Every structure is written in structure tokens, then in C-alpha cells.
Amino acid sequence: MLIYVYDEVTKSIRKYNKRLTDQMPFSKNKYLSVKEFRGNSKSNIIWTSKQTIESFNKFRSKWGKPIYVGFAFQRITRGGHTNQSQHYAGTALDIAQNLSNNERKKLYNLAKKMNIWSYVEPINMTPRWIHVDKRYGKAACGAGYPTLKINSKGNYVFVLQETLQNNNYNVSMDGIYGSKTLTATKNYQRKAGLSNDGIVGCKTWRSLVE
């Protein structure tokens, strides 16, 4: 199992080879396994951010007992979430599906109170689970993924590269917006009738994922 972890602070990507039974990189005290994070994606390549895992560590430590993770990482080509879902970027977790309503409400309140997540979905929108994510960057469309350009790195570049591959463009999945990703993006934009400047803004994201 190949795992890429992006660090928002250092702007670097680390690569790990792990088994499903191993702990996720940066997970402490066996809080989150590779199997739990990969979920039903069935992917042999997954990605996340260091800050996502560290936030889960703090959250789990404060809660003081195991937190069930029903859904986390997913490949955009498999779907199952909204078009610009943070699950595809590896920065989101849907948790607490096994708790009673009262216990889930307590955990939800803790998630809000700790202020360690970028977004905690309103509980009325997720009555049977809690959605938390550690998204980063200013969204190109007001919500969703940030604008990307040459030399961008990280989780959202992985999503871009996967969608380009799904459109039959020859790009590697490495999380780095290099020359091949730039060429593929420009060619896609040209074919889609968009401004082919290689900048992945709102219109390009919507064309790619919606």
C-alpha cells in the first residue's frame, strides 16, 4: 500500500509503503489504521495530509476512547461523495456512525469546541454521522478545491492528476504540478473550450469533476 502524506507547513510530500494492518503515518497510539483510512476505496494508492492525521490524534486524545471511522479516503473515480468532496483529497473523515444520538451529539460538540478542524458539517445535515475535514487553501468556487497552477503541490494536485488520468491524459500520480500535468491540463482545457492557461480555477474544476 503506497501512501502519500502532504505537509502544509513544509510544502513537502512524503511517501510510505504500509500494510493495511499498519498505522497511518503520523497516527499515534494506534488511533487510525491504514485499513480504517482507506475504507472501501479499494485503492492501492492513497493520500492525506499530516495536518489531517494530527488533528485526528488531538481529537481522539481529547475524546478519550476509540472513534469509529466509517468513511475517510475515496478515489474520485469511484465517487460516492459530492463533486469537490474533501474525501477525494484525503482530508476528510465521516465518523461516529456507531454511537447513540446523545453520544454523537457530545462528540460533535467537542469537534466544534476544539477548533482544530477546518470544517465540521452541521449536525442536521449528517444525522447519522459526523463529518470533519482539514481542507486548506482558498476555494476557487467559494467552496471546494483551491486554484492550482504550475509548481503547486499537495492533496488537490492528486485529485487533478486522477481526473486527468480518467480523461486519458498521461500524467503520473505524484501530487506535484509539473510540466506533464501542465501540458495535460492545457490540452484538457482546450478540448473543453476553456481558457487553456494551465490554471485550474473554478471553471476547470467544475468541468473536471461535475
Predicted stretch roles:
Residues Y4-Y6, N83-A92, Q97-N167, V171, ...:
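Catalytic cores and adjacent binding grooves of peptidoglycan-active enzymes
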Residues Y6, T10-T126, I130-Y136:
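Cell-envelope/glycan interface and biosynthesis
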Residues R190-K191, E210:
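Short, basic alpha-helical nucleic acid-contact segments in DNA-binding proteins
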